C-alpha cells in the first residue's frame, strides 16, 4: 500500500492553488512539474512516502487559470516560492522535470535552502538551446492558438509517442491525465510561458547555477525528442556537486520508460 497522500488548497495572491502532500519527518521533497502535465505526474514518487509536496502551478492541473496572471518564467518561479512560504516550506530537497526547472531560478538566489537536487530532462536554463518543433509552433502568434484549438485527445496521444524512448504509445491513463485538464486556461498559460522563453532568456536565467552547491543528480533519457543529452552534460557541468546519469533507450519521462528511476531518485534523496 502506498503512502497516504493528502490533497489541499490554498490561496496565494488571490489565486486558488491545488497541492498534494505526504506528511513525514525531516526535510520535505518538493516535486516541480512541467508542461503539459501537473502534480499528478509525481504520484509514483509521492506514493513512496514523505515528507513530500507537489503543487499544481496556476494554469495547470487542478489549480486556477486566471486570465490576469504572470505566466512568465520569472512570474511562475516567484509564485512557486510564495506558495512554499505559505505552506511553511523553507529548506527543501528539490526534484524538477521539464518546466519544473523554473524552481532553479529561486534556488540560485537562495542555494542554502536546497539540501539536495534532482534534475530530470529539464528545460535548459543554459546557453545554446533551440526549441523543439511543437514549442516553435506555440511561440508563433496565431499558429499556437490554431494548434491548441485543433488538438484532440487522439492527436495529443500521437504527439506524446515521441516522448517515449521507443516511440510507443503513452499509457492511456497518462494521456487522460493531461487531456482531462487541457482546457482553454491551460492552453493560454502554455502559450504565455513559451512566448516568454526566448533562448537568451533561458540562458540568462541559469547564469548562477554554480551557486547551487548541494549534492545533485542529473538524470536524462538519451531518446528525449525535446531536450538533447548535451544539456544533461551542461547541467552536470554547471552544478558543482552533480552526478550525471544518461539512460539508454529512455525518453522525456524516464520514470515511465524505466520505473526503476523512482528508486534511483528516492535513494539519492535519502
What is each of the regions a protein language model found here?
Residues 223-227:
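Acidic catalytic loop of the alpha/beta-hydrolase fold
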Residues 1-29, 49-50, 89-90, 263-270:
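Alpha/beta-hydrolase fold catalytic core
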Residues 21-62:
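Conserved HGGG/HGGXW glycine-rich cap/lid loop of the alpha/beta-hydrolase fold
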Residues 250-259:
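Catalytic histidine-centered segment of alpha/beta-hydrolase-like enzymes
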Residues 116-146:
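Flexible "cap/lid" loop of the alpha/beta hydrolase fold
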Residues 54-96:
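Active-site loop/oxyanion-hole signature of alpha/beta-hydrolase fold enzymes
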Residues 128, 149-210:
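Conserved alpha/beta-hydrolase catalytic His-Asp/Glu region
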Residues 212, 218-220:
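Short beta-strand/loop motif that positions the catalytic acidic residue
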Amino acid at each position: 500500500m502506498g503512502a497516504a497522500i493528502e490533497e489541499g488548497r490554498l490561496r496565494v495572491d488571490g489565486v486558488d492553488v491545488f497541492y498534494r502532500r505526504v506528511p513525514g519527518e525531516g526535510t520535505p521533497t518538493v516535486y516541480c512539474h512541467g508542461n503539459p502535465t501537473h502534480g499528478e505526474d509525481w504520484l509514483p514518487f509521492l506514493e513512496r512516502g514523505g515528507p513530500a509536496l507537489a503543487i499544481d502551478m496556476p494554469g495547470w492541473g487542478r489549480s486556477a487559470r486566471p486570465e490576469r496572471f504572470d505566466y512568465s518564467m520569472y512570474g511562475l518561479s516567484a509564485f512557486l516560492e510564495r506558495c512554499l512560504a505559505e505552506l511553511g516550506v523553507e529548506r527543501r530537497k528539490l526534484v524538477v522535470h521539464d518546466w519544473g526547472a523554473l524552481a532553479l531560478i529561486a534556488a540560485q538566489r537562495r542555494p542554502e535552502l536546497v539540501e539536495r537536487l534532482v534534475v530530470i530532462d529539464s528545460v535548459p536554463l543554459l546557453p545554446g538551446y533551440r526549441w523543439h518543433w511543437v514549442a516553435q509552433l506555440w511561440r508563433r502568434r496565431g499558429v499556437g492558438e490554431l494548434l491548441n484549438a485543433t488538438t484532440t485527445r487522439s492527436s495529443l496521444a500521437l504527439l506524446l509517442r515521441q516522448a517515449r524512448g521507443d516511440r510507443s504509445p503513452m499509457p492511456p491513463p497518462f494521456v487522460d491525465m493531461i487531456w482531462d485538464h487541457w482546457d482553454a486556461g491551460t492552453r493560454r498559460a502554455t502559450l504565455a510561458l513559451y512566448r516568454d522563453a526566448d533562448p537568451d532568456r533561458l540562458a540568462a536565467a541559469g547564469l548562477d547555477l554554480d551557486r547551487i552547491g548541494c549534492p545533485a543528480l542529473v538524470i536524462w533519457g538519451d531518446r528525449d525528442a525535446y531536450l538533447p543529452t548535451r544539456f544533461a552534460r551542461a547541467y552536470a557541468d554547471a552544478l558543482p556537486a552533480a552526478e550525471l546519469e544518461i539512460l539508454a533507450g529512455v525518453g522525456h519521462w524516464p520514470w515511465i520508460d524505466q520505473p526503476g528511476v523512482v528508486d534511483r531518485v528516492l535513494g539519492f534523496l535519502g
